[in-house]
Amino acid sequence: MGFTDFVSDAGLSLANNYLATRSYIVGHAPSQADVVTYKAFTASPDAEKYPHVARWYKHIASYESEFPTLPGDASKAFTAYGPEGSEASANPKDKPAEEEEEEDLFASDSEDEDPAVVAERNKNLEEYKKKKAAKGPKPAAKSLVTLEVKPWDDETNLEELEANVRAIEMDGLVWGASKFVAVGFGIKKLQINLVVEDEKVSTDELQAQIEEDEDHVQSTDVAAMQKL
């Protein structure tokens, strides 16, 4: 299944999902795939409703004078490109985890219990809670995370990208060392270490906040995570 149209909401949403993690329709450089797709639009896409399509459309427009010289097959229809199979629909967001209830270590499945047994169990439970409270809070669990932040292309300003990443502040988050790693085609990605308090910082929320910098960031991945 490829692109369908760029007029209906369904068609534009399909394209927006496809371009959420891509700078170009095919590969890592502009080609005739971008040209035929660009020409299939009758108007500029709405940047508020379809931000990824709008960003791609604006970027490809800057190559308009080079359209005839870009590589690829100019005879293909735009419907030959786009998502395939499982890519055609957006992945549903993970449901929030249900709050864990404190396990009752002395519970019983029986509904008809001897009152004396119930009283004894409740007494044991209270003693358990008192001992647990007397021990005080446990040290905060922390993790060392290596995060990879991928830019759109080789023209992305990596210094600005890193500055925007480090500008994010959260209680329980400490940024560490970083470096730029080559991925090919002249493109480099940011690899940055950070320490998080597990109960305070969600890596999913942190990644989502980083990816809000749509001018610089294509996507993020957790490359490694280690409990401290």
UniProtKB/Swiss-Prot annotation:
One of its GO terms (molecular function) is IgE binding. It holds the Pfam family EF-1_beta_acid. Keywords: Allergen, Elongation factor, IgE-binding protein, Protein biosynthesis. Residues 74-116 are annotated as: Disordered. It comes from the Eukaryota. One of its GO terms (cellular component) is cytosol. The keyword Transmembrane does not apply. Residues 84-93 are annotated as: IgE-binding. Residues 97-115 have a biased composition (Acidic residues). CDD domains: EF1B (cd00292). EF-1 is composed of 4 subunits: alpha, beta, delta, and gamma. Belongs to the EF-1-beta/EF-1-delta family. EF-1-beta and EF-1-delta stimulate the exchange of GDP bound to EF-1-alpha to GTP. This is Elongation factor 1-beta.
